[in-house]
């Protein structure tokens, strides 16, 4: 995992040192790193009984958001993953970044991991980029992985800034 996380950080650093948003305002190029520990006990409004666990690393550099999500123990029928906005402790929040599942999820289910990158203003965002960055920076976001057995989410963890 450490080599993948390092590769993720290097990639994020190479993508852009200084960027500007759609309004021409320069966005600081300070690397920000957030992590989340994923488990069923973190699911809301009701915890999920599961042996599945995982972790996520999300980096922000300028207007570039990069993620790596790893499943640390087996999870069955993984179908989706997202960064959500916390609505309240007992309520699921809106999807802000969709990890775009597909063939990559079979790799995550065996512990390989899923990575991706999105730029502020990119059409793959589920919400405007500025609000997405704000909710991550303000500690109001979480990573959630969904399965066929638990379509509302099987493992979840709040993103916490570590750098």
At which residue positions do the language-model features occur?
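Sec-dependent bacterial lipoprotein signal peptides
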Residues: 1-18
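Metal-centered catalytic cores of metalloenzymes
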Residues: 19-81, 85-163
């Amino acid at each position: 995992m450490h080599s993948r996380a390092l590769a993720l950080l290097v990639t994020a650093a190479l993508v852009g040192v200084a960027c500007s948003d759609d309004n021409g305002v320069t966005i600081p190029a300070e690397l920000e790193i957030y992590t989340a520990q994923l488990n069923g006990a973190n699911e809301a409004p009701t915890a999920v009984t599961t042996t599945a666990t995982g972790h996520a690393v999300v980096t922000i550099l300028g207007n570039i958001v990069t993620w790596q999500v790893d499943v640390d123990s087996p999870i069955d029928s993984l179908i989706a993953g997202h960064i959500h906005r916390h609505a309240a402790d007992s309520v699921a929040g809106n999807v802000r970044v969709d990890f775009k599942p597909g063939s990559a999820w079979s790799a995550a289910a065996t512990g390989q991991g899923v990575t991706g990158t999105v730029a502020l203003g990119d059409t793959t965002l589920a919400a405007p980029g500025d609000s997405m960055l704000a909710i991550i920076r303000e500690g109001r976001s979480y990573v959630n992985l969904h399965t066929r057995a638990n379509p509302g989410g099987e493992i979840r963890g709040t993103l916490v800034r570590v750098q």
